[in-house]
Amino acid sequence: MPKKAASPEIKAASFETSLSELEQIVTRLESGELPLEDALNEFERGVQLVRQGQQTLLQAEQRVQILLSDDVDAPLKPFTPDTE
């Protein structure tokens, strides 16, 4: 089976925008009316959005942990997310 070309990167969108798009994708997939190729493309986009959302949530959680650190004397450092 030929190897598929890498899909283009998702443009950075707000978490809420990505979540809304993901909900729309789920609705279209659950309708069962999409042709197979369209359904696969929608599924692939959904997986990308989920991964982006997970990364956003992880970064937010890390920022909260830094802010709630028990060491009140520790200086706050700017949060720099890992980019992949």
From Swiss-Prot:
Q: Which Gene3D superfamilies match?
A: Exonuclease VII, small subunit
Could you tell me which SUPFAM superfamilies the record lists for this protein?
XseB-like
Any one cellular-component term (Gene Ontology):
cytosol
Where does it primarily localize? Answer: cytoplasm
**Does the keyword field hold Transmembrane?**
no
**GO biological process: one example:** DNA catabolic process
- Cellular localisation: Cytoplasm
Role noted for this protein: Bidirectionally degrades single-stranded DNA into large acid-insoluble oligonucleotides, which are then degraded further into small acid-soluble oligonucleotides.
* Subunit relationships: Heterooligomer composed of large and small subunits.
Protein name from the UniProt record:
Exodeoxyribonuclease 7 small subunit
According to its UniProt entry, this protein's organism is Yersinia pseudotuberculosis serotype O:3 (strain YPIII)
What gene name is given for the protein in this entry?
xseB
